[in-house]
């Protein structure tokens, strides 16, 4: 059983970003919160919206930072420090250029080119040992097109594929919390759209 106490969904705040690929982490967190009937509420001391859920008797905090993506670590560090949550007890969901839409994968630690993840690493004392949920949004092909791609809205087909991966990721997060990472990975990593 994974000892996750905080689940974070990354995105940019505001209605203009709500439906962009860069907010796939927020989409996941909203889906998880809806599944557990736990509305996210503004919490200024944590620079975001928070909720509490219980899975298999475990008390878990949900956090959507309302800072911009590249300042996500401010919110994560504030909540983690307040509740004495270690990096190894955190799951961070975010958009991943290197995976196609419809694919989501867990990864423990390591580096990332995702700005929100990099800021979390920096704010957590350069500790990279938190669990990541990488939600595929696809790569536009050339690095000069990345910003427009992540800040753009997915096509209807891409959106359906991303939502399918998120639905499966919510189910697998339950497996992660009730059983273990290996079982959750095996199921999530074999998901096909």
From Swiss-Prot:
Give its E.C. classification number. Answer: 3.1.1.29
- Identify this protein by name: Peptidyl-tRNA hydrolase
**Which BP terms does GO give this entry?**
protein quality control for misfolded or incompletely synthesized proteins; rescue of stalled ribosome
What is the superkingdom listed in this entry's lineage?
Bacteria
GO CC, any one term: cytoplasm
Q: Which GO terms describe its molecular function?
A: peptidyl-tRNA hydrolase activity; tRNA binding
Q: Which organism is it from?
A: Alteromonas mediterranea (strain DSM 17117 / CIP 110805 / LMG 28347 / Deep ecotype)
**Family indicated by similarity:** Belongs to the PTH family.
């Amino acid at each position: 059983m994974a000892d996750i106490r905080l689940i974070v969904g990354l995105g940019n705040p505001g209605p203009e970003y709500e439906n962009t690929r860069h907010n796939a982490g927020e989409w996941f967190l909203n889906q998880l919160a809806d599944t557990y009937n736990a509305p996210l509420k503004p919490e200024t001391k944590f620079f975001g919206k928070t909720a509490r859920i219980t899975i298999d008797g475990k008390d878990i905090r949900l956090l959507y930072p309302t800072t911009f993506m590249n300042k996500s670590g401010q919110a994560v560090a504030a909540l983690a420090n307040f509740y004495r949550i270690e990096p190894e007890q955190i799951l961070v969901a975010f958009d991943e250029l290197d995976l196609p839409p419809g694919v989501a994968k867990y990864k423990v630690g390591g580096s990332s080119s995702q700005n929100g993840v990099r800021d979390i690493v920096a704010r957590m004392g350069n500790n990279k040992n938190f669990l990541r949920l990488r939600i595929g949004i696809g790569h536009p092909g050339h690095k000069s097109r990345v910003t427009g791609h992540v800040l753009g809205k997915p096509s209807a087909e891409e959106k359906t594929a991303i939502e399918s991966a998120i639905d499966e990721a919510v189910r697998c997060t339950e497996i992660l919390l009730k059983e273990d990472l290996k079982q959750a990975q095996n199921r999530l990593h074999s998901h096909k759209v």
